[in-house]
Amino acid sequence: MPETEEISKGLEDVNIKWTRLTTIDGNKGILRYGGYSVEDIIASGAQDEEIQYLFLYGNLPTEQELRKYKETVQKGYKIPDFVINAIRQLPRESDAVAMQMAAVAAMAASETKFKWNKDTDRDVAAEMIGRMSAITVNVYRHIMNMPAELPKPSDSYAESFLNAAFGRKATKEEIDAMNTALILYTDHEVPASTTAGLVAVSTLSDMYSGITAALAALKGPLHGGAAEAAIAQFDEIKDPAMVEKWFNDNIINGKKRLMGFGHRVYKTYDPRAKIFKGIAEKLSSKKPEVHKVYEIATKLEDFGIKAFGSKGIYPNTDYFSGIVYMSIGFPLRNNIYTALFALSRVTGWQAHFIEYVEEQQRLIRPRAVYVGPAERKYVPIAERK
């Protein structure tokens, strides 16, 4: 059958919902959360919890509202033993995001009475943000062969997470960098993971199942896995002096993909990448081995922009974020960087789920254009040739 009808491959430029959460101008490189530019948010020294609140409630919190909100998030730090067991029964070599999926799926299995409710949805989401911190801490500690640990309340979400993950008091520089990373990865409209989660909750499945679906999509190398792929690329080059040769051999002549470059929406420099680059430069300057990776990245960036900038292909947020995670102290293994992405994005996922279910609820059920054989007659197996 000929392909006579148009389809939207990859759902590109298909609008599936209205949103007050995030707006992107891909041509100008602008990203705003609820009307606030990410540059202003970061420059103002905002805490991640303020941005979490913005996504769930639509406004920045007062001091009193923020204190109350933090208490709700911190309730989620105490995850049940069966969730920790779901993580620790897996091989330590397992993918970190798959471990998160197992833990969140365990939450979904236990929440048999979940009902979408405007009066409680945001409290459920806030507590789940806390649970995601505890889950990610224990995923990391299991991979690193460390005993189970739960985050404890502190001055910030970022600090509680790092203290529990590393088993020591995080430095101010580490906390500030993690806080910024959490904010920058909070949301990005409806990429593959958010869309996957929306499909799940459009059936009125529970919040946790929506997160599990989103994690499954995020796990792929074309979405959340790009940060680790970019670092692996820098490691392959090994030395700044080898960048030009590697670029010509692998990208220009080898036709390989330059990881961390290009974005479906942005046709200019990703504003998040600019911020991550600045943090990577600052943090790596105190760690020679990491700074060498940063030097490789910046030199490769120059070649990439010269070759592809005229086509609207520039560094995206994943190009430098891995260097930031590495500088904080997270190793390149088990897809850990993508799990850190998920720790940030759980806020945006849930905000989109709530917005959709409360205001625009409709089962997402697209169609496919059939291009297979026309009508055929069934032939019994003994008569087939």
From Swiss-Prot:
Allosterically inhibited by NADH. The lineage of its organism: Archaea, Methanobacteriati, Thermoplasmatota, Thermoplasmata, Thermoplasmatales. It comes from the Archaea. Keywords: Allosteric enzyme, Transferase, Tricarboxylic acid cycle. The active site is at residues 223, 263, 318. Its EC number is 2.3.3.16. Pathway: Carbohydrate metabolism; tricarboxylic acid cycle; isocitrate from oxaloacetate: step 1/2. Belongs to the citrate synthase family. Pfam families: Citrate_synt (PF00285). It is an enzyme of class 2 (transferase). PANTHER family: CITRATE SYNTHASE, CITRATE SYNTHASE, PEROXISOMAL. The gene is gltA. Gene3D superfamilies: Citrate Synthase, domain 1 (1.10.580.10), Cytochrome P450-Terp, domain 2 (1.10.230.10). Homodimer. This is Citrate synthase. Disulfide bonds: none annotated. GO terms for molecular function: citrate (Si)-synthase activity. It catalyses: oxaloacetate + acetyl-CoA + H2O = citrate + CoA + H(+).
